[in-house]
Amino acid sequence: MRPATGSDAVDAIIYAAHRIRITTGAALREHGLSLSSLKLLRALADGDRSMREVSQALHVSPRTITDMIDGLEAHGLVARCPHPSDRRVTRLHLTQAGTHELVGASTAAERVAAAAIGALDQAEQHVLRSLLERVCVPAGESAG
Protein backbone atom coordinates (compact mmCIF):
# COMPACT_ATOMS: atom_id res chain seq x y z
CA MET A 1 0.00 0.00 0.00
CA ARG A 2 1.40 3.36 -0.98
CA PRO A 3 1.61 6.20 1.55
CA ALA A 4 -1.17 8.78 1.49
CA THR A 5 -0.36 12.03 -0.27
CA GLY A 6 -1.65 15.57 -0.08
CA SER A 7 -3.44 14.86 -3.32
CA ASP A 8 -5.29 11.95 -1.69
CA ALA A 9 -6.48 14.24 1.10
CA VAL A 10 -7.63 16.88 -1.36
CA ASP A 11 -9.44 14.24 -3.43
CA ALA A 12 -11.25 13.07 -0.27
CA ILE A 13 -12.26 16.65 0.59
CA ILE A 14 -13.52 17.26 -2.94
CA TYR A 15 -15.47 14.00 -2.96
CA ALA A 16 -17.04 14.68 0.45
CA ALA A 17 -17.98 18.24 -0.55
CA HIS A 18 -19.45 17.00 -3.83
CA ARG A 19 -21.60 14.36 -2.10
CA ILE A 20 -22.81 16.82 0.54
CA ARG A 21 -23.59 19.44 -2.13
CA ILE A 22 -25.61 16.94 -4.19
CA THR A 23 -27.55 15.72 -1.15
CA THR A 24 -28.16 19.25 0.11
CA GLY A 25 -29.25 20.37 -3.36
CA ALA A 26 -31.80 17.56 -3.54
CA ALA A 27 -33.19 18.43 -0.10
CA LEU A 28 -33.45 22.13 -1.01
CA ARG A 29 -35.13 21.43 -4.36
CA GLU A 30 -38.04 19.99 -2.36
CA HIS A 31 -38.45 23.56 -1.05
CA GLY A 32 -38.00 25.09 -4.50
CA LEU A 33 -34.61 26.52 -3.56
CA SER A 34 -30.97 26.12 -4.51
CA LEU A 35 -28.03 26.37 -2.13
CA SER A 36 -27.33 29.86 -3.50
CA SER A 37 -30.90 31.01 -2.91
CA LEU A 38 -30.80 29.61 0.63
CA LYS A 39 -27.65 31.64 1.28
CA LEU A 40 -29.39 34.73 -0.07
CA LEU A 41 -32.43 34.20 2.18
CA ARG A 42 -30.09 33.72 5.14
CA ALA A 43 -28.34 36.99 4.27
CA LEU A 44 -31.70 38.76 4.57
CA ALA A 45 -32.81 37.00 7.76
CA ASP A 46 -31.29 39.65 10.03
CA GLY A 47 -32.91 42.54 8.21
CA ASP A 48 -33.22 44.39 4.94
CA ARG A 49 -30.06 44.85 2.89
CA SER A 50 -29.17 46.56 -0.35
CA MET A 51 -28.47 44.59 -3.51
CA ARG A 52 -24.82 45.65 -3.23
CA GLU A 53 -24.56 44.45 0.38
CA VAL A 54 -25.99 41.06 -0.56
CA SER A 55 -23.73 40.82 -3.61
CA GLN A 56 -20.67 41.50 -1.46
CA ALA A 57 -21.77 39.19 1.35
CA LEU A 58 -22.29 36.28 -1.04
CA HIS A 59 -19.26 37.09 -3.22
CA VAL A 60 -21.26 37.08 -6.44
CA SER A 61 -21.78 39.67 -9.15
CA PRO A 62 -24.61 42.19 -8.92
CA ARG A 63 -26.07 40.70 -12.11
CA THR A 64 -26.23 37.26 -10.48
CA ILE A 65 -27.97 38.75 -7.43
CA THR A 66 -30.48 40.46 -9.71
CA ASP A 67 -31.29 37.15 -11.41
CA MET A 68 -31.61 35.37 -8.06
CA ILE A 69 -33.86 38.09 -6.65
CA ASP A 70 -36.06 37.99 -9.75
CA GLY A 71 -36.77 34.32 -9.11
CA LEU A 72 -37.26 34.66 -5.36
CA GLU A 73 -39.48 37.71 -5.84
CA ALA A 74 -41.61 35.84 -8.40
CA HIS A 75 -42.26 33.20 -5.72
CA GLY A 76 -43.10 35.82 -3.09
CA LEU A 77 -40.08 35.08 -0.91
CA VAL A 78 -38.29 38.42 -1.29
CA ALA A 79 -39.55 41.94 -1.98
CA ARG A 80 -37.72 44.94 -3.37
CA CYS A 81 -38.30 48.09 -1.35
CA PRO A 82 -37.10 51.65 -1.94
CA HIS A 83 -34.49 52.98 0.45
CA PRO A 84 -36.15 55.55 2.75
CA SER A 85 -33.62 58.31 2.07
CA ASP A 86 -31.73 57.30 -1.09
CA ARG A 87 -33.96 56.59 -4.06
CA ARG A 88 -31.00 55.15 -6.01
CA VAL A 89 -30.80 52.22 -3.60
CA THR A 90 -33.14 49.25 -3.59
CA ARG A 91 -33.46 47.35 -0.34
CA LEU A 92 -34.26 43.65 -0.25
CA HIS A 93 -36.77 42.41 2.28
CA LEU A 94 -37.47 38.83 3.33
CA THR A 95 -41.24 38.33 3.18
CA GLN A 96 -43.26 36.28 5.63
CA ALA A 97 -43.38 33.49 3.02
CA GLY A 98 -39.61 33.83 2.62
CA THR A 99 -39.10 33.51 6.36
CA HIS A 100 -41.30 30.40 6.41
CA GLU A 101 -39.40 28.86 3.49
CA LEU A 102 -36.06 29.77 5.08
CA VAL A 103 -36.98 27.85 8.23
CA GLY A 104 -38.05 24.76 6.29
CA ALA A 105 -35.09 24.80 3.92
CA SER A 106 -32.61 25.45 6.74
CA THR A 107 -34.03 22.49 8.65
CA ALA A 108 -33.65 20.28 5.57
CA ALA A 109 -30.07 21.46 5.02
CA GLU A 110 -29.25 20.89 8.70
CA ARG A 111 -30.57 17.31 8.46
CA VAL A 112 -28.20 16.69 5.55
CA ALA A 113 -25.29 18.20 7.49
CA ALA A 114 -26.12 16.12 10.57
CA ALA A 115 -26.24 12.95 8.48
CA ALA A 116 -22.98 13.83 6.73
CA ILE A 117 -21.01 14.22 9.93
CA GLY A 118 -23.22 12.18 12.24
CA ALA A 119 -20.56 9.50 12.68
CA LEU A 120 -18.28 12.11 14.30
CA ASP A 121 -18.63 13.12 17.94
CA GLN A 122 -18.54 16.81 18.93
CA ALA A 123 -14.78 16.81 19.50
CA GLU A 124 -14.14 15.22 16.10
CA GLN A 125 -16.46 17.73 14.43
CA HIS A 126 -14.49 20.54 16.05
CA VAL A 127 -11.20 19.04 14.85
CA LEU A 128 -12.60 18.60 11.33
CA ARG A 129 -13.71 22.23 11.18
CA SER A 130 -10.36 23.44 12.53
CA LEU A 131 -8.45 21.38 9.97
CA LEU A 132 -10.62 22.60 7.10
CA GLU A 133 -10.15 26.20 8.23
CA ARG A 134 -6.38 25.69 8.23
CA VAL A 135 -6.52 24.17 4.75
CA CYS A 136 -8.58 27.13 3.48
CA VAL A 137 -6.27 29.83 4.86
CA PRO A 138 -3.65 29.48 2.08
CA ALA A 139 -6.46 29.90 -0.44
CA GLY A 140 -7.38 33.18 1.26
CA GLU A 141 -10.74 31.93 2.49
CA SER A 142 -12.41 30.85 5.70
CA ALA A 143 -14.30 27.60 6.19
CA GLY A 144 -17.02 29.45 8.09
Predicted segment positions?
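N-terminal leader segment of winged-helix/HTH proteins
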Residues: M1-H31
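DNA-binding alpha-helical recognition surfaces that contact promoter or target DNA
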Residues: R42, D67, S130
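Short amphipathic alpha-helical segments with heptad-repeat character
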Residues: V10, I14, H18, H59, ...
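Charged, amphipathic alpha-helical coiled-coil/dimerization segments
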Residues: R21, D70-C136
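Long, contiguous secondary-structure blocks with strong helical propensity
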Residues: R2, Q56-H75
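N-terminal helix-turn-helix DNA-binding core of bacterial DNA-binding proteins
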Residues: I22-T64, A143-G144
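Short, charged, intrinsically disordered terminal tails
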Residues: R2, V137-G144
